[in-house]
From Swiss-Prot:
Record PROSITE patterns: GLUTR
Example of a GO MF term: glutamyl-tRNA reductase activity
Described function: Catalyzes the NADPH-dependent reduction of glutamyl-tRNA(Glu) to glutamate 1-semialdehyde (GSA).
Binding site for substrate: T49, C50, N51, R52, S107, E112, T113, Q114, Q118
Family note: Belongs to the glutamyl-tRNA reductase family.
Name of this protein: Glutamyl-tRNA reductase
Length: 432
């Protein structure tokens, strides 16, 4: 069954999410290797962003305690705290949750499209490292399909808002950004988003990054309203400008009290990184806004999106039902093939017995075989037609299980591609 363990801004604070975050691929790979050793876990992937850690799996049976215990040990967190905080979803609930996440209905900022790219990256990583197979492939691709339908059929993402854009919106409330210079620390995806929103607001941006080439490349994409420098010069910039947006992947805070000088004007620091980049004392001239603080601005946008969200949830509900109908349909064809194969095997076996006992001449063997197969074909025609008519219907799962029991089809199904998936798991260019 499908299984999801979720830690988000809804059930955890930023301090706990910092500890749980998978800021590098080595840590993510280590965790997936650990949990994939469990006999009940067949496939798994991890989505890790500043607002959520989602463990999505296909399992034989529920195993939340093992997964949470493994996460607790790796991240040095109390297991009982995680079990208390975790939201756990099973089967249809897990698929509905995954579709909601992909469609940005579960995001801090409903309607932002950044999560789709993050899910894509998480899926690609799991496929590349052999943690993900056909079960999660079906689920993730269906999640992308659902997200596309939500975007196309509602207005929820027509004006996309990310955490970075919310930070810039908050800055615009505090001052007119036109012609001001803002410092963006980090040249990754979140830093680039912040820079784009700042430029759109009329500001000029300075990109600071450890990798100077990456900062240069970003500035080339941003255009003439941007410049760049090395992160080594951070202190100089911190004590020269008013607005700072920090979005690095550093494991510890990079902006601390030791770098801050007292100045006679106000400075605003927006920490949009997890783990946090900023650990400084606030005073009358220094204000710090962390990821969780931005929810205040987010609430202003939620009212405008509630109606679209209701429409989107309707789509997600229908797509969830459609997904499980699709899985049932996948199971029907192997049942039909297995029954026909079983009939052929019994016919051939009885034919050989008849030949051995002299009930049938060898010269008549092929004619007898054709006759027997025609009889079975005619006999199985109506059951086959009726089974095909069950495709997409609610009772198909009950009938499939009954057919497996009545015809003892367990062994016959082993040689059939029961879990056929139309997505190419070998070619990374096609799995998206």
């Amino acid at each position: 069954m499908y299984y999801c363990i979720s830690f988000t801004y809804k059930n955890t604070d930023i301090a706990l999410r910092e500890k749980l975050s998978f800021s590098n691929e080595t840590k993510k790979s280590e965790f997936l290797k650990i949990i994939s050793t469990h006999e009940n876990i067949e496939e798994c992937l991890v989505i890790s962003t500043c607002n959520r850690v989602e463990i999505v799996a296909f399992v034989k049976m529920a195993c939340a305690e093992f997964i949470v215990k493994s996460l607790a040990l790796l991240c040095d967190v109390d297991k009982d705290i995680l079990l208390e905080k975790a939201d756990i979803f099973e089967d249809s609930g897990a698929i509905h949750h995954l579709f909601s996440v992909a469609s940005s209905l579960d995001s801090l900022v409903v309607g932002e499209t950044q999560i789709a790219g993050q899910l894509k990256d998480a899926f690609a990583f799991a496929v590349k490292n052999s943690f993900c197979g056909v079960h999660l492939s079906r689920a993730v691709h269906s999640a992308f399909k659902c997200a596309t339908k939500v975007r196309n059929e509602t207005q929820i993402s027509k004006k996309p808002i990310s955490v970075a854009s919310v930070a810039v919106a908050k800055a615009k409330e505090l001052a007119d950004l036109t012609q001001k210079k803002a410092v963006v620390i980090g040249a990754g995806e979140m830093g680039e988003l912040a820079a784009k929103h700042l430029i759109a607001a009329g500001a000029k941006v300075i990109i600071l990054n450890r990798d100077l080439q990456k900062a240069k490349d970003l500035c080339e994409r941003l255009g003439v309203l941007s410049e760049y420098d090395s992160l080594e010069n951070l202190k100089k910039y911190l004590n020269q400008y008013e607005f700072f947006f920090s979005a690095t992947n550093a494991p510890n805070a990079i902006i601390t009290n030791s770098l801050i000088e007292e100045l006679p004007y106000k400075r605003y620091f927006f920490d949009i990184a997890v783990p946090r980049d900023i650990d400084i004392n606030e005073n009358e001239n220094i204000s710090v806004f962390a990821v969780d603080d931005l929810e205040i601005v987010v609430q202003k946008n939620l009212a405008l999106r509630e109606q679209e969200a209701r429409m989107a949830y309707g789509i997600i509900g229908r797509e969830t039902s459609e997904f499980f109908r699709y899985l049932n349909d996948l199971a029907l064809m192997p049942i039909i093939k297995a029954i026909r194969l079983q009939a052929k095997e019994y016919a051939d076996k009885q034919l050989e017995i008849a030949l051995k006992k002299g009930y049938l001449k060898k010269s008549d063997k092929e004619e007898a075989r054709k006759l027997i197969h025609q009889v079975f074909k005619a006999f199985l025609h109506m059951p086959t037609v009726n089974l095909k008519h069950l495709q997409g219907k609610m009772q198909s799962d009950t009938v499939i299980n009954a057919m497996r029991y009545v015809f003892d089809l367990k062994n016959n199904l082993e040689g059939l591609n029961q879990y056929k998936c139309e997505f190419d798991m070998e070619n990374n260019d096609e799995i998206y």
